[in-house]
Regions:
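Charge-lined substrate channels and their catalytic hotspots, especially those that engage the 3′ end
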Residues: 2-295, 302-348, 380, 384, ...
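A short macromolecule-binding patch
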Residues: 105-110, 171-177, 655-672
């Protein structure tokens, strides 16, 4: 038996395999010294050729500075610079990578060397010896911190065990669930499962069900699954709702006495028709000929939500309301956001207000920030306010027309100062009571929307200037700002190169205003063109992301030196922070600890991005559901993405996006040209480029993966 084993090892042990086994051995025992004899024994090398091969590899490893010869014939890991910490990134194609904390070169991690690391895990790796003409490669030796241990999927229940089948492409294997950890889950249920262990020798992680969402395919189940997938809550904690129920809605005598009274000033709200949480209202009155007082009144949420209480802690954790296609997941309990704080018509409400004195040229002659009590006279939808603007008729027509005139002046001033006018089309769905999408339509931003937008921007900027704008010899107090950095020059160059194919160009150097004006010219030029949505999307990607920070750098996209978020405390936690600090500082209070508020700003920025991703996932789900009932139908579209695995096409009629897989382009073998965003056929030289118009047929709709497959229609 021994001879057979020896012969088998001698035949099958390749140099690459022996190298990896030696590397693994030295990394597993980095402080031990080995002789050749000990190495041969550890690796079960029993033939002379294998031992000689081992000696040759050891010599190479010394030359590569991977090993050191501590005394003649005894070797030890040369650990100088070879152990690194960073983030593991798992790819669905197996090309996993490691990004070092020090920002160095990305390192390839083969699947066999990943040690069950999952996407975005914080890990420690050992760097392999550098091989000629090979990219750096390493092995995960320790998982320091899991990025995520909870996954959403569909249960497949067998007699004695179950698996969670997940469409998460960055989880290499399905999750094994012992029968006693199913929590009543049945075959076909959507569930949330937590990984509890992953033994080194096991192919699958072991998990336990922590929540059953319902039957796969049901609307509420799928919407909750999207929330769970992004780590967002889909139920409100009972103790937080109980705390909200105890908050009195009545306004106290002290509040009446301490606040500026606007109850007899014409005041109204303008919101989407399906809105329930009205957190802003406008008031207007003529002070004297040519001078108007305009009030921007914001729900005084922090009067009711005390800092450090259970409601506040939950709001801080959530940081934002989440708007899925068919529902809102509020940051605050419903009693607060839809009842006590909501500026509903004909009800006395507490507000935090910015009051402007404005002349007919749209110039702010004076402003003040005060706590108020208001009473809204009318609740307008955007459509109702728009009708007043267009016809000049309707309730409060003089007030709305005056506000609209002022808003247009404010907007013109902003754009002249270099603000960028992104006006994206928003996809909306008409859905029935079961959540089924009946039609797709585009939400337009009209004058009524822009009226509200301009006064909210003005209030936000005024609040930021009040705290941030201080004399040069003074230091501004700590405050959360909404900041937006200048575009990256390389991204602008790439954008310019891309739009050249459509006959457009932008400035990539010069002053901030010159660059932003050239971008605005581009956005004007593409209006109502077939490439509009594509060019707008690529232009947006060239911009930096706006975020929250206590370190003010201004807001490039709005062309403001000072900007914050003050106007939506019902749905954004940063606005609650701003309200509290503004109240403190207006009363003469001292500054606060910067580190604490910077951390809250970072968390809020992160949660804002997660919420946006969840919202997009819900739109994508409904698009796939909608198109799934239109299999075989033909649509016109535009190529919105070109990859090595196929073409992405966005449909003109409804902005639904799907893919024409490379395998379905069967008339030729196509080469992917990454630089020029195109596929080119080898034999017939047919070319598919980004922005090309195409006609497709809906071939497949996979709700589980939120994917649409299209087939190209040749014309």
């Amino acid at each position: 038996m021994a001879k057979k084993k020896e012969k088998k090892a001698g035949k099958r042990m390749k140099k690459s395999e022996m190298s990896e086994r030696l590397i693994s051995l030295f990394h597993t025992k980095p402080n031990e010294t080995f002789s050749l004899k000990q190495l041969s024994s550890s690796l079960n090398l029993t033939t002379h050729p294998l031992k000689m091969l081992c000696a040759d590899i050891i010599t190479e490893m010394i030359e590569d500075d991977f090993l050191q010869e501590v005394e003649k014939g005894h070797y030890k890991l040369n650990d100088h610079g070879l152990i690194m910490t960073g983030v593991f990134q798992r790819k669905s194609n197996g090309k996993n990578s490691f990004i070092p904390d020090d920002g160095g070169e990305t390192i390839f991690i083969a699947e066999r060397n990943s040690a069950h690391a999952m996407n975005n895990d914080k890990v420690k790796i050992a760097l392999f010896a550098k091989r000629k003409n090979r990219n750096p490669e390493g092995e995960v030796i320790e998982i320091l911190e899991r990025a995520n241990d909870t996954f959403v999927g569909t249960l497949k229940v067998e007699k004695f065990y179950a698996f969670l089948l997940t469409e998460n492409r960055t989880l290499a294997n399905d999750i094994f669930i012992p029968k006693d950890k199913l929590k009543g889950g049945k075959n076909g249920d959507k569930a949330v499962v937590k990984i509890v262990e992953w033994p080194e020798e096991a192919k699958n992680p072991i998990g336990q069900v922590i929540d059953i969402l319902g039957k796969a395919g049901e609307n509420t189940t799928e919407m909750h699954a999207i929330l769970a997938e992004f780590g967002l809550p889909y139920v409100y904690p009972k103790n937080v709702e109980t705390a909200a129920e105890k908050i009195p809605a009545e306004i106290s005598e002290a509040d009446y006495a301490e606040r500026e009274d606007f109850r007899n000033v014409t005041t109204f709200t303008i919101d989407p028709k399906d809105a329930k949480d009205f957190d802003d209202a406008l008031s207007i009155r003529l002070i004297k000929p040519g001078l108007w007082e305009v009030g921007v009144h914001i729900a005084d949420v922090t009067h009711y939500v005390k800092e450090g209480g259970v409601i506040d802690k939950e709001a801080e954790k959530r940081a934002t309301s989440v708007y899925l296609v068919d529902r809102t997941i509020p940051m605050l309990p419903e009693r607060l956001c839809n009842f006590i704080c909501s500026l509903r018509p004909d009800e006395e409400k507490l507000a935090f207000s910015v009051i402007f004195n404005m002349n007919e040229k749209g110039e702010v002659k004076d402003s003040r920030i005060v706590h108020t009590i208001i009473k809204s006279d009318r609740r307008f939808t955007y459509e109702e306010a728009q009708k007043v603007i267009e016809t000049g008729e309707g309730d409060y027509k003089e007030e709305i027309l005056e506000l609209n005139k002022q808003a247009q002046i404010l907007r013109k001033q902003r754009l002249a100062a270099g603000a960028i006018d992104f006006d994206r089309v928003e996809v909306k769905f008409e859905i029935d009571e079961t959540g089924k999408p009946l039609s797709v339509y585009f939400k337009e931003s009209k004058e009524a929307n822009k009226l509200i937008e301009e006064f909210m921007l003005l209030a936000n900027r005024t609040v930021a200037e009040k705290i941030g704008k201080v004399p040069k010899n003074k230091k501004a107090k700590v405050f959360p700002y909404r900041i937006h950095d200048l575009p990256d020059p390389d991204k602008l160059e790439n954008l310019n190169w891309f739009i050249n194919r459509f006959g457009y160009k932008i400035r990539t150097s010069g002053s901030k205003t010159e660059i932003s004006k050239s971008i605005n010219r581009l956005l004007d030029d593409i209006k109502n063109k077939k490439e509009q949505n594509l060019v707008e999307t690529v232009s947006l990607r060239a911009m930096q992301k706006a975020r929250y920070s206590t370190h003010n750098i201004g807001h490039y996209g709005l062309a403001f030196d000072y900007y914050t978020h003050f106007t939506s405390p019902i749905r954004r936690f940063p606005d609650m922070m701003v309200h509290r600090l503004l109240t403190r500082y207006l009363a003469g209070g001292r500054t606060v600890q910067e580190a604490k508020y910077e951390e809250l700003c970072d968390h809020s920025s992160e949660m804002e991005q997660i919420a946006a991703n969840a919202e997009r996932a819900s739109v994508k789900y409904k698009q796939v559901e909608f198109m799934g009932e239109r299999l075989g139908m033909e649509f016109d579209g535009v190529i919105s993405g070109v990859t090595e695995w196929g073409l992405y096409v966005e449909l003109n009629e409804n902005k639904c996006e799907g893919m024409i897989p490379m395998r379905d382009l069967g008339d030729d073998y196509y080469d992917f040209d990454e630089k020029n965003y195109c596929l080119t056929g080898r034999r017939h030289h047919k070319k598919f480029s980004l922005g090309d118009p195409v006609t497709i047929k809906v071939a497949r709709a996979n709700l589980e993966k939120k994917q649409l497959d299209f087939a190209l229609i040749e014309k």
